[in-house]
Amino acid sequence: MNRQPIVQLSNLSWTFREGETRRQVLDHITFDFEPGEFVALLGQSGSGKSTLLNLISGIEKPTTGDVTINGFAITQKTERDRTLFRRDQIGIVFQFFNLIPTLTVLENITLPQELAGVSQRKAAVVARDLLEKVGMADRERTFPDKLSGGEQQRVAISRALAHNPMLVLADEPTGNLDSDTGDKVLDVLLDLTRQAGKTLIMATHSPSMTQHADRVVNLQGGRLIPAVNRENQTDQPASTILLPTSYE
């Protein structure tokens, strides 16, 4: 029996007005994401990667089409229902860490959960467990300005996973880091999501960030185009994908 896709995009389009004309960023995309897989969304700056993640999460609504997450038609819901669903079921990791400077590492992770009604004690237990997993158990009382960029992103990843979301969206999560630090942070993100069986959709402009993905799709001309490997063999790892010439 085939598994039901966790995310289904159906005829999804998004346009915006630029002067007297309308620009089409996403063009009637239909695509399924499977439970527990890591999909790398590869595209140049301005190709619409962030917009697509915003539509999946319900931050924005499409011009046409639908997004369904585990049977929940998020595009058809009210703003309040979309917000509550996002809070409970989706974890988001951004390029910029967005940590609150006046809160400690532990408090940055626990605050969203406390605002959602989780007890302070329970939120702290979860946060400490995540900090242990990302190698920052000794930094829970540290403030963000005392952390390196890689450490701040580890905290942001922990915050995104603290509520045990079914879906994790990562928008250029290593884009503000140097190459070595970015690789280590990506390893942390992949380890945590795979251990927990989460679906991870990561937007990136860097082909090197796609090598561990289960699937790679290129966002070009408003469309999602599945990548193929150089030998045209489906059993090859994602690191052998054939990239559009604009990325090579």
Curated annotation (Swiss-Prot):
One of its GO terms (cellular component) is plasma membrane. The keyword Nucleus does not apply. One of its GO terms (molecular function) is transmembrane transporter activity. Disruption phenotype: Disruption of the gene reduces the ability of M.tuberculosis to bind to host cells. Disruption does not reduce virulence in a mouse model of infection. Keywords: ATP-binding, Nucleotide-binding, Transport. Residues 7-246 form the ABC transporter domain. This is Uncharacterized ABC transporter ATP-binding protein Rv0986. It comes from Mycobacterium tuberculosis (strain ATCC 25618 / H37Rv). The lineage of its organism: Bacteria, Bacillati, Actinomycetota, Actinomycetes, Mycobacteriales.
